[in-house]
């Protein structure tokens, strides 16, 4: 019974990540401070997932991937914060960033409830889903709605990193037992 509830919660959390781009597209307009908040939040969320993986996984591929996620996303956060400071732009919470945080809390609970190979599978499945969703949101919402040229350029420069993460996660996913 508990496994069924946990799986259901994970599926709901994963599905809700796919809803983020759809939800964001229904947002009439995101200001640059709101876009900055979404970008920062998305990176902070993935760092949180990676830290859970670094604590729980024993799989060398998962551990290396999680270490890369932490390093890369913390680097993006530092760059985003520096850009925001340079542009005198204060990130502003909004429905999309709040939804990201709410979904992340559920996903973290689900990940923390898993162990061993079940954890590894849940983590990497989430990473694939999460990166697909974030890429779709950056391409379909954040870049088109960015007014500031530097912010738009920053988001465009982050996309290849996100796509590399997705490719890496997909490769690891294909190597894990079903």
What is each residue range found by the language model?
Residues 2-9, 18-178:
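His/Met- and acidic-residue-enriched segments that coordinate or traffic transition-metal cofactors
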Residues 12-14:
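Sec-dependent N-terminal signal peptides
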């Amino acid at each position: 019974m508990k496994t069924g509830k946990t799986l259901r919660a994970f599926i709901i959390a994963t599905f809700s990540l796919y809803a983020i781009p759809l939800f964001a597209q229904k947002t009439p307009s995101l200001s640059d401070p709101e876009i900055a908040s979404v970008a920062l939040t998305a990176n902070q969320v993935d760092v949180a997932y990676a830290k859970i993986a670094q604590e729980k996984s024993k799989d060398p591929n998962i551990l290396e991937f999680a270490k890369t996620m932490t390093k890369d996303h913390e680097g993006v956060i530092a760059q985003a914060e520096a850009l925001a400071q340079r542009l005198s732009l204060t990130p502003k919470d909004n429905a999309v960033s709040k939804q990201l945080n709410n979904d992340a809390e559920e996903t973290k609970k689900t990940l923390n409830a898993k162990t061993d190979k079940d954890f590894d599978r849940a983590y990497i499945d989430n990473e694939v889903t999460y990166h697909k969703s974030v890429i779709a949101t950056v391409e379909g919402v954040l870049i088109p709605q960015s007014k500031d040229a530097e912010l738009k350029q920053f988001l465009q420069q982050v996309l290849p990193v996100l796509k590399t993460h997705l490719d890496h996660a997909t490769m690891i996913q294909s190597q894990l037992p079903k």
